[in-house]
């Protein structure tokens, strides 16, 4: 998943479907370059002395990029990303002595799997791709972001309908009403944040972060519904404090996410007008959280990122894909 998340997961062995599967198969995961246990690790962290105040947003992004390159190494970054991951999977297949690859891929992993099938069609026995990423969006980071925002809004709509049906939270099943209600709650938290037991503020930013995280998994919807209900009532339980304190992503995985996305996709240089148009389009694609009071029209991370792979140049787009591919939950 990710990109930026490890593929080695020792806890998978405790899932009952895996127990049955292991009667016939060995399950092998790997951490892509720069991720998890792979070394060197992608590192974009800055010391307190390196984090400057009173600078432009563009300079802040450039400082972060410089930290990524300095800490990780430019030569290392040139060999990180989806392009290298595809070749690494085939090297793993060869090292195992398997004539063909049998694999399961999730989310971002489906991008690697699809590229593998495209590049090595005769090396595929069978691959299941769950939560499919459209690899044709690799050439256009904006299209990828736009589709993701649209998917988030569609999920929010389903969540609101579920909330109304189960009476789990005060959102309406009507799309426009639900968005308005959510905006009213965001506005309320923005002007009068709640205070948790540690004295920390719970503002609109915390609700947006919690929402984008918990929407992803239907099993997390009850927690999100409880948070919305409690915030509407001006209270915060221990359960919701725990959910808020859980890290959405580690610093390492966040660093790797940004670097790999930008290495793979990058962005063309935009005029201020084009940049504003794109940010408006993204906001309109996910209107439920279109409440960014500090929205900037400065260049984003990928637009300023200087190192790119040759992934799109080397794609074999007219190849016949192997028959042993199963696509799930596109």
Annotate each PLM feature.
Residues 181, 185-188, 210, 227, ...:
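Charge-rich, solvent-exposed alpha-helical interaction surfaces
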Residues 1-206, 259, 265-330:
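Gly/Pro-rich cap/lid or specificity-loop segments adjacent to the active site
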Residues 237-265, 269-270, 275-276:
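Long, low-complexity segments enriched in small/aliphatic residues
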Residues 194-209, 216-220, 247-255:
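Structural motif
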């Amino acid at each position: 998943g990710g990109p930026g998340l490890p593929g080695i997961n020792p806890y998978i062995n405790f899932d009952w479907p895996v127990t049955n599967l292991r009667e016939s198969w060995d399950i092998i995961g790997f951490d892509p370059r720069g991720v998890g246990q792979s070394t060197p690790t992608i590192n974009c962290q800055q010391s307190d002395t390196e984090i400057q105040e009173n600078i432009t947003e563009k300079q802040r992004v450039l400082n972060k990029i410089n930290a990524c390159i300095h800490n990780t190494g430019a030569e290392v970054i040139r060999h990180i990303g989806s392009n290298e991951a595809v070749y690494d999977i085939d090297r793993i297949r060869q090292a195992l002595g398997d004539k063909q690859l049998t694999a399961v891929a999730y989310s971002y992993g489906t991008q690697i799997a699809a590229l593998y099938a495209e590049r090595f069609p005769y090396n595929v026995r069978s691959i299941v791709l769950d939560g499919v990423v459209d690899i044709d969006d690799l050439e256009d980071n904006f299209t990828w972001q736009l589709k993701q925002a649209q998917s988030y809004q569609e999920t929010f709509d389903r969540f609101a309908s579920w909330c109304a049906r189960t009476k789990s939270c005060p959102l309406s099943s009507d799309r426009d009403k639900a968005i308005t209600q959510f905006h009213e709650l965001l506005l309320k938290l923005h002007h009068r944040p709640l205070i948790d037991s540690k004295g920390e503020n719970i503002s609109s930013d915390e609700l947006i972060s919690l929402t984008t995280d918990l929407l992803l998994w239907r099993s997390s919807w009850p927690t999100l519904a409880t948070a919305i209900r409690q915030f509407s009532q001006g209270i915060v339980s221990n359960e919701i404090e725990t959910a808020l304190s859980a890290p959405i992503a580690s610093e390492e995985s966040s660093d790797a996410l940004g670097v790999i996305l930008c290495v793979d996709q990058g962005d063309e240089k935009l005029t201020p007008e084009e940049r504003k148009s794109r940010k408006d389009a993204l906001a309109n694609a996910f209107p439920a959280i279109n409440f960014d009071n500090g929205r900037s029209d400065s260049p984003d991370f990928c637009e300023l990122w200087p190192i790119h792979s040759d992934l799109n140049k080397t794609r074999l787009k007219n190849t016949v894909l192997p028959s042993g591919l199963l696509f799930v939950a596109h």
